[in-house]
UniProtKB/Swiss-Prot annotation:
Residues 155-166 have a biased composition (Low complexity). This is Uncharacterized protein C17C9.11c. Residues 21-43, 120-171 are annotated as: Disordered. Keywords: Metal-binding, Zinc, Zinc-finger. A zinc finger (C2H2-type) spans 3-27. SUPFAM superfamilies: Ubiquitin-like (SSF54236). GO terms for cellular component: cytoplasm; cytosol; nucleus. Coiled coil: none annotated. Disulfide bonds: none annotated. GO terms for molecular function: K48-linked polyubiquitin modification-dependent protein binding; zinc ion binding. GO terms for biological process: negative regulation of proteasomal ubiquitin-dependent protein catabolic process; negative regulation of protein K48-linked deubiquitination; negative regulation of protein ubiquitination.
Length: 240
């Protein structure tokens, strides 16, 4: 049986060859024919084989060039993506460093402002204590009566300073200032309770001073404040 492709006039020796031809060319119009398939001479077969080889070689070269171009394109896309990713990473790092720098500057400014406030409070406390001493000395001079001693008798006089009966503490927390006065016999625990009530926080478990730097934990919370070196007045920072 010989089949002829009506679309390209090619003669095919079997149904299988027609199916193969249809697969390669998408031709689907065939009919039986009485024509005979001309047998090729050895030279024609050789030329046909050589032509097929050339076509296969050309096809392979085209595929190689296409693959190379595709590889170049993919490399450019990848390189561009990597550049964009690296640029985005650098931008994020720069922004993070800028935020850190701003935080450091803000913290330094807040520390300087806090130090300024504490120094001002210490200066006010010094002036207040100096004024209290001046008033006390003036009162002693005004109320002291002269004592006459017999001639040739040894005389002596003593002046006893009355210890403070209360402590005055300036509590600094989160931008708030709370001044609390407690009796000299009261403890740091009682002071902590007053801090909690007046500043609407939980009772602190520790107090610190900045000038001079010192800390007072729960191990001294039950001691009277007049037994601690922060008496009679101090600027305290509560901690939890």
């Amino acid at each position: 049986m010989v089949l002829k492709c009506l679309e390209c006039d090619k003669l095919l020796s079997s149904i299988e060859m027609a199916e193969f031809h249809s697969t390669k060319t998408s031709h689907d119009q065939f009919e039986e024919t009485e024509e005979e398939i001309k047998k090729r001479s050895p030279e024609e077969l050789k030329q046909a084989i050589e032509a097929l080889r050339e076509k296969a070689k050309e096809k392979k070269e085209k595929e190689r060039i296409l693959a190379l171009e595709e590889k170049k394109t993919n490399y450019k896309i990848l390189q561009k993506s990597n550049d964009e990713t690296a640029q985005a990473m650098r931008k994020m790092q720069d922004q993070a460093r800028l935020r850190d720098l701003q935080k450091i500057r803000q913290q330094k400014a807040e520390d300087a402002e806090q130090r300024k406030k504490i120094l001002a409070e210490i200066e006010r406390d010094k002036k207040r204590r100096a004024a209290e001493r001046e008033n006390k000395n003036s009162s002693v001079k005004e109320t002291a009566a002269p004592i006459k001693q017999p001639k040739n008798a040894n005389s002596s006089s003593t002046c006893t300073r009355t210890p403070p009966t209360s402590g005055r503490f300036s509590i600094r927390h989160d931008g708030q200032v709370c001044n609390i006065t407690i009796a000299a016999e009261e403890t740091l625990r009682q002071l902590a309770q007053q801090v909690a009530e007046k500043m609407n926080v939980s009772p602190p478990t520790k107090f610190t001073t900045t000038f001079p730097r010192a800390s007072y934990g729960t191990d001294v919370f039950d001691k009277p404040v007049n037994q601690l070196d922060l008496f009679p007045s101090a600027v305290l920072i509560p901690q939890w």
